[in-house]
Swiss-Prot record:
Alphabetic keyword roster: Amino-acid transport, ATP-binding, Cell inner membrane, Cell membrane, Membrane, Nucleotide-binding, Translocase, Transport
Listed name of the protein: Methionine import ATP-binding protein MetN
Main localization category: membrane
Subcellular location per the Swiss-Prot or TrEMBL entry: Cell inner membrane
Subunit and partners: The complex is composed of two ATP-binding proteins (MetN), two transmembrane proteins (MetI) and a solute-binding protein (MetQ).
Family: Belongs to the ABC transporter superfamily. Methionine importer (TC 3.A.1.24) family.
Higher taxonomy: Bacteria, Pseudomonadati, Pseudomonadota, Betaproteobacteria, Burkholderiales
Length: 348
């Protein structure tokens, strides 16, 4: 549905141009929710605005719904943009128009007949749960309701793609969950392809099928959300995940491990960080490892979460025993689908 090929984008700057995007390659499949996450200034907004050519890339090609946007004339590009809806962080509603009229605006500008506009807007307001507020003005509704108006307006022309530019970052957590739930419902009910950018890994966790991590204008990692959570490869990804699934051990735990090392240096053991997902999360693997390999195992830290219906868990464990048994235990865990990260106790 969307393909970005070797995209670079620079802005004028002094003493040298600012490189916002560098060699970006992305492919978004039809009907999926694709997230792009990164810190402030990483290039997220620049990237999403390249998709509909609000930012024209300095280099590369943009393909959306079978058309190469970067090769289109101005008039053909305007027509192609009808296939791409967009919602924004600050809603961008017209304060002088009612909820109904804000949603109707793109249809009016396209010359749609009034009777068809009324039918389409009624349908959309029902979809986003705002039929009762149709005559209200933006100043009379909440932030979450304003974003629902923005979503309805973005869907007015029946686009194939919806772009979400930090659409929930100005909302409280409960309203954010509600808006993300609405986007997921629209995606599932209508097969709409959604690309959303965010700096919050919680948003990715709740709604995205796949995710790309952007850092300093480059895509540093991408994949299925469950895979990225369980097998993060890049330091930026690990730090973003750590914000919602912290891995830092309490100082009291670190002190206890070091005391064990000092008391029994010949059995100082090993610190393992384990990540598991799906069916593996329900299997009694640790008790099996203890029995099979004769190890002492102490759980230091752990948590279990849910990523769109898939159980995901992480554990930090201190394992002590013979070196050969430790090696075999790690191999056994990995063969069972557990992601195992070995750490030196001295570096904890």
């Amino acid at each position: 549905m969307i393909q970005l090929k070797d995209i670079s984008l620079s802005y004028p700057g002094h003493p040298a141009p600012v490189q916002a995007l560098q060699g970006v390659n992305l492919q978004v499949r039809a009907g999926e929710v694709f997230g792009v996450i990164g810190r402030s200034g990483a290039g997220k907004s620049s990237l999403i605005r390249v998709i509909n050519l609000l930012n024209r890339p300095s280099q590369g090609q943009v393909h959306v719904a079978g058309a190469e946007l970067t090769a289109l004339s101005a008039s053909a590009l305007r027509a192609a943009r009808h296939q791409i809806g967009m919602i924004f962080q600050h809603f961008n509603l017209l304060s002088s128009r009612t909820v109904f009229d804000n949603v109707a605006l793109p249809l009016e500008l396209s010359g749609v007949r009034p009777a068809l506009i009324r039918a389409r807007v009624d349908e959309l307001l029902d979809l986003v749960g705002l039929s009762a507020l149709r005559e209200r003005y933006p100043a009379q509704i909440s932030g979450g309701q304003k974003q629902r108006v923005g979503i309805a307006r973005a869907l007015a022309s029946k686009p194939k793609v919806l772009l979400s530019d930090e659409a929930t970052s100005a909302l409280d957590p409960e309203t954010t969950r509600s808006i993300l739930g609405l986007l997921r419902q629209i995606n599932r009910d209508f097969g709409l392809t959604i690309v959303l950018i965010t700096h919050q890994m919680q948003v990715i966790k709740q709604v995205a099928d796949r995710v790309a991590v952007i850092d300093a204008g480059r895509i540093v990692e991408q994949g299925a959300v469950i895979d990225v959570f369980t097998r993060p490869q890049h330091a930026t990804t690990r730090s973003l995940i750590d914000e919602i699934l912290p891995q830092e051990l309490p100082l009291s735990v670190i002190a206890r491990i070091r005391a064990l090392m000092a008391a029994e240096p010949q059995r100082s053991g090993q610190l393992l960080r384990l990540a598991f997902a799906g069916d593996g999360s329900g299997q009694p693997l640790l008790s099996d490892v203890i029995r099979r390999f004769g190890l002492d195992l102490n759980i230091l830290h752990g948590q279990i979460d849910d990523i769109q219906g898939q159980t995901f868990g992480s554990l930090a464990v201190h394992v002590r025993g013979a070196s050969a048994q430790l090696v075999q235990a790690v191999a056994h865990l990995r063969s069972a689908g557990v992601v195992v990260q070995e750490e030196e106790i001295a570096h904890v």
